[in-house]
From Swiss-Prot:
The gene is CHS6. This is Chitin synthase 6. Induction: Expression is slightly lower in the yeast form than in the mycelium and shows a maximal expression in the log phase at about 14-18 h of incubation. Highly expressed during the chlorosis stage and the stage of white tumors of plant infection. It comes from Mycosarcoma maydis (Corn smut fungus). The chain crosses the membrane at residues 108-128, 374-394, 762-782, 795-815, 822-842. GO terms for biological process: chitin biosynthetic process; fungal-type cell wall organization. Glycans are attached at N737. InterPro entries: Chitin_synth, Cyt_B5-like_heme/steroid-bd, Cyt_B5-like_heme/steroid_sf, DEK_C, Nucleotide-diphossugar_trans. It comes from the Eukaryota.
Amino acid sequence: MSTKDAHDPFATPLETITHDPLAETAGLKADYDKRAYGEANPALMGTLEKDDMANRPIDAVEEVPTTSIRKWWVRLTWFTTWWIPSFVLSKCGGMKRPDVQMAWREKFTICAIIFWLCAIILFYIIAFGRLLCPDYDKAWNLSQLSQHAGENDYYAAVRGTVYDFSKFYKGDHSDITNLQTSSDLMLQLAGQDLTGYFPVPLSVGCQSLVSDTSLALMPTANNTPLISQAIHTSGPLQGDTSSKLHDINWYPDRFLPFVKKLRKGYYVYSKKDLANQGQWRNWAVIHGKVYDLSNYLNTVSTYQTNPAYSFLDSSIVSLFKSQAGSDITADFEDAMSTFNQTYRGATQACLDNVFYVGRTDFRDTARCEVQNYLLLAFSVLLVTTVLAKFIAALQLGTKRSPEQQDKFVICQVPCYTEGEEELRKTIDSLAGLEYDDKRKLLFLICDGMIVGSGNDRSTPRIVLDILGVDPKIDPEPLMFKSVAEGSKQLNYAKVYSGLYEFEGHVVPYIVVVKVGRPSERSRPGNRGKRDSQILLMRYLNRVHFDAPMFPLELEIYHQMKNVIGIDPAFYEYILMVDADTRVEADGLNRLVANCADDSSIIAICGETTLDNAEGSWWTMIQVYEYYISHHLSKAFESLFGSVTCLPGCFSLYRIRSSDKGRPLFISNRIIDDYSENRVDTLHKKNLLHLGEDRYLTTLVLKNFPSFRTKFVPDAKALTSAPDRFGVLLSQRRRWINSTVHNLAELVLMPELCGFCLFSMRFIVFIDLLGTVILPATAVYLVYLIVTVATKSAPIPYISIAMIAAVYGLQAILFLLKRQWQYIGWLVIYILAYPVFSFFLPIYSFWHMDDFSWGNTRIVVGEKGNKKIVAGTDDEPYDDTMIPLKRFSEYQREVWEEEAAAPSMRSGMTGASGPFGNSQAILHSGPPSVYRAGGSAYAGSVAGSDYGAGLGDYYQNTNVLQKPAHSRQTSAAALSQMGGSQAASMMFGTGTPSVYGMAGMGSMYGMPGSSASMYGLPNPMMNTTASMYGLPPMLANPLGANHSPAHSDIGVSMPVSQQNTGGSHIWAQPPEAATVAANSGRGSGMQARPVSTLSALNATNPFGVTAVARALAVNEASDPTDEEIKSAVQTYLANQPSLMNVTKRSVREALVAAFPNAELSYKKSMINKAIDDTLSGGAQA
């Protein structure tokens, strides 16, 4: 057995297979590509796989190391859910598998953490302050009391207590003859301290100290009541004996019991007010209570000869005189300690009953203030963050107009279940971009043979019909490894390529259709969006490193390099666009221009708005959210160069660095992390299955922290938002859960810029906290509205200020940007706020484990390393099933083997397989067979006879019958007129141009036989060219000729128009040259197409293979300016193409030519010499 066979799992000869599962299709003739599939027929792949894996132990236990964070999380999970037995989850919850049960436990733990976090926050904001300061909302000072002076809000204070007289003051409650009260008179007293209007008889208030009922205090001028008829004098001093006030016990027996029902709280004084009024009031603080002896001292002073008025001890009175407005508690206790218990009690009762006027404002104490200060600190922090985001978004100025860029860009579009209208909109918008058509490639990946809801065809068929691909084109599926578990890692896909014309734009495209294994029945080929992204990323990575490739990747390489005519290594950027997104015409150019200006940008995104804003109520509530999420969050993060969420619907990634060509987006680090197959934990499920686009951004930031991710508001795209609540619910479930898990990853990432609170990690933490407490925010807002509406508590000015700051700054933002329509969208968004902040998060958190769990691996242990056992119901898979080969080796083998090998179909020299003849379509039938219903668009190699045996390859191919013909090549349909392009446009024949010019060369007017599409003749190369006019991919490098009568493409190709030399990037094997010389000119067969990077000339912008002669070394240490200018002219004159020459490369060449000279200070002179030479101003 050869070395190749030893490593080839499909080396089993077909003769050893006794059963043909497709024997009923024996009448159909087709063959398969052994180089792409190995030695096995793809239709029998399932049988061969099982035979190959028969000796492998299927129940082998695989140990996966567990991180310390994972171990601690598992402990916390079990600590939280220990009281829920596993058999309950199995019996009641239907969760039979341990990994599903563990995910439910993790979900429950996360929901419990979120619940307690929300509860703690609500408790702290609403209830914690009440526990620390129970009567915080039951105290009023003079200014606060004066606010309750309305007809329906009538508050007043009497002896340190606030009462609500709103339901009392309107009635006539006077029983004094000829004295009536009115509501107007009563309103004059609202919101005031009415202590002076309710004097207490001294014989009642100070029973043990005063016995004379005729004694009364004389108020000072400042304490004299202004409305005399409102004074409630009781006892013998009341002149009207018929009034109830004549009763000396009216105050304690009638008044106090009545107002007790109206009590609201305390009347308080601040220490500042006490000190200020202490200049004219003799009051002081004792044990937090305020006593006012001003009227007493005024009375004593007035009646100095009557000792009955001096009923208080002089030691007590002297304290009020000497320390007015101060706290005299200590001195008061010292004075009271000299009294006996009876006199001490009588004195204290007298002070409380007659001279008590209120309390010190306890709300100013540390116990009551600590919560407010903490809330204020958090509020300032949040408002500062919002203000910073506002300033970041406030980028006023004129809209920039960058120059047209010339970088090569791949526009990747993953397609799943979208409808024809959405797909056409996306494809047309990309084709119509104001960007050089030759430098953009539409790369569409159809994720499985899926028929979307409401579609009458599968998604791949819709895509191919839009592009104009002939339904008869049926390429053979090729193997590649998918991102999946178990046997689903083996996948098959078909490749189509061609040109798509839209409104004058002619853009190349490649369509990859994942079709799956032959045994797949449910959603064949579908592996998810992440697999589609990895497919392209891994392919470009292998192109960059010239690494061994899967058969599918080899075919894509061939299609890009030999059919489309552009080396895949030329592409510098990947534009990722969803299949329901429409990019504005200048969007791509703006993104590329920003990346070209700043080489440190690794990824960039633009603004995404809604294309169906007024589609339904559910779309309208999303308009404002989309706008703010871009212009606040992303604009702010962009200032730090750390946009944490680049939307998958419209983002541009840099493939390699601009200085040294290091792989960036296609680096092994990103691909290895992003292509994780074992997604068996809740965290990984949310990262890789729900939020793959966001996690991709996280990986970019994690692996390349020195590079920047940016947001450009000028680049715009429009996407379709969910217009039904069910779809919105599903989308937000994915978004919210993936946001939580991705932010948790970013919080642990020390590479983010900044330090401590001044860092992106802190901003990420704030975003994470804000996401998980969204339900608490909604509940608090409801509480706030109810509190303010019912006036059951003081107005929370801090909370209202925060809300005003958040939405006020947002309103200022779109008003300054003159986006007036967002005023209405803001109102709609506020109305729908409960949906976004409460219902959707609650639903999302509880359905965090809502996945489709595979059955390939079952977790059997969580202690130490995780042990995983392969499921016995899964088909076996091993990486050795898929052959790998470098493109250069593969191509060299093709040249060596097929140049001399007879074709299975016609016996003529040529190549079959993915790199077979791209021009000749070998068939024994007449040429007319290939002219009917043709298309100008090509797939990869066809899997069945052209026009016969159509349908599914696995169903319609008899793989055991010896094939009589070689399969068609990928350019089979280029011979026909179909879609939007004619065959003559593709092959540069001598036929008249469809644009009315003399004759067609290449598609874009590069080297051709005559005038190109754009009228650029090329006298240097008298041959046909590639799709883009590069060296002729469809020319005959071996000198073969096609006769007009029997030309496979139905056009005349004179010998003079064919390249008999065949310059190409690969050295032509001597064997191929010999065969070419002996093949004859009438064989009707062309050999391998030549490279797109050959036969360079001045009009070939892509030619880079010709090597320019190096400048002669000059040992002078101080060369003259003339010598330098001469060297510049010589270097530029030796360049085969100036398209890839930069000023920097010229300067580097000069540094090498003058090794002993210091040329850095002559940079400006060198640049001027370059400009003069290119403009023709320099003299040779």
